[in-house]
């Protein structure tokens, strides 16, 4: 039997109550598996050896089966991390769920330190108030929190304030500054970046995508990761045996092909091949992902 013995991020639903300008998902349809198929997917993940399950979205807590799926996975012995915008964490039913079945971590994205910047980036009036309400409730409940401080052009002037607010709450935080194209190769998220806050990536040193972890979308289409979604495996059709092809798919997708084939600088490339492909599809400036583009910025 195939056993991956690692992680299995799962997009339970792409639907979201925010409309963030920088979102890498692009289109966010509210759709996903029915309850029975969600249970079947979780059973397959457990049989495959998934120990750490990250449930994400969209906004995962909006899915009609989120609480049932979360509890089922928790009772199966998985360590659970939830990626959320925090806007619904005030709900009593969610607080009871996390009290009864403690998560390993709730990773909450912060999109500003003021109502104006937060609501502008999320393109939703009232988003800031919902975020603060959710965070106040989560902190009072003692939930294990981490904050991703998302820095964009809309909130760049508040980057230090966002980090300071997270520190004031005594919540571990990390600044996220470099956006990526959408999973469809759209360049819209790149337009939201704050040029002054972009960081130079370290050389890509390889990863175990498809070998020690995989990614499942809302319809149980499995890929090596959330970026490299080519050659997806339909777990509802193939079952656990379909996962045996993941390693071969991963090795093929990581090959330096297309415009990267034969590159003399591949040993110090800053992005993996699947991510480079998205940048190329988005017609992004070369310097945003490739060392060859450094000459453009230097001149």
Where are these regions (language model features)?
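Conserved alpha-helical substructure of the radical SAM core
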Residues: 1-104
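Conserved C-terminal portion of the radical SAM core fold
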Residues: 11, 48-54, 74-83, 102-110, ...
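Conserved radical SAM core fold
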Residues: 17, 60-62, 86-90, 104, ...
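Iron-sulfur (Fe-S) cluster-binding segments and ferredoxin-like electron-carrier domains
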Residues: 25-33, 229, 233, 266-298
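C-terminal accessory region of radical SAM enzymes
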Residues: 142-143, 179-202, 221-279
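Short, small/polar residue-rich loop motifs at catalytic or cofactor-binding pockets
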Residues: 207-211
């Amino acid at each position: 039997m195939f056993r991956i013995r690692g992680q299995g991020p799962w997009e339970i639903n792409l639907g979201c109550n925010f409309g963030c300008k920088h979102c890498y998902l692009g289109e966010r349809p509210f759709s996903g598996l029915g309850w029975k198929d969600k249970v079947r997917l979780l059973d397959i993940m457990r049989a495959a050896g998934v120990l750490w399950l990250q449930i994400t979205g969209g906004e995962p807590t909006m899915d009609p089966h989120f609480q049932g799926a979360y509890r089922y996975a928790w009772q199966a012995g998985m360590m659970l991390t939830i990626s959320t915008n925090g806007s619904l964490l005030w709900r009593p039913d969610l607080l009871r769920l996390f009290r009864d079945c403690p998560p390993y971590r709730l990773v909450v994205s912060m999109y500003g330190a003021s109502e104006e910047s937060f609501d502008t980036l999320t393109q939703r009036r009232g988003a800031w108030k919902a975020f603060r309400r959710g965070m106040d409730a989560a902190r009072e409940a003692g939930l294990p929190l981490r904050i991703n401080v998302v820095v964009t052009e809309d909130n760049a002037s508040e980057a230090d304030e966002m980090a300071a607010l997270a520190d004031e709450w005594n919540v571990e935080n990390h600044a996220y500054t470099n956006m990526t194209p959408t999973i469809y190769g759209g360049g819209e998220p790149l337009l939201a970046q704050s040029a002054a806050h972009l960081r130079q990536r370290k050389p890509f040193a390889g990863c175990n995508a498809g070998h020690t972890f995989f990614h499942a979308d809302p319809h149980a289409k499995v890929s090596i990761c959330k970026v490299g979604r080519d050659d997806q495996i339909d777990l509802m059709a193939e079952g656990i045996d379909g996962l045996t092809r993941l390693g071969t798919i991963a090795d093929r997708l990581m090959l330096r092909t297309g415009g990267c084939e034969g590159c003399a600088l591949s040993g110090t490339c800053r992005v993996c091949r699947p991510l480079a492909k998205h940048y190329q599809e988005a017609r992004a400036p070369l310097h945003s992902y490739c060392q060859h583009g450094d000459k453009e910025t230097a001149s």
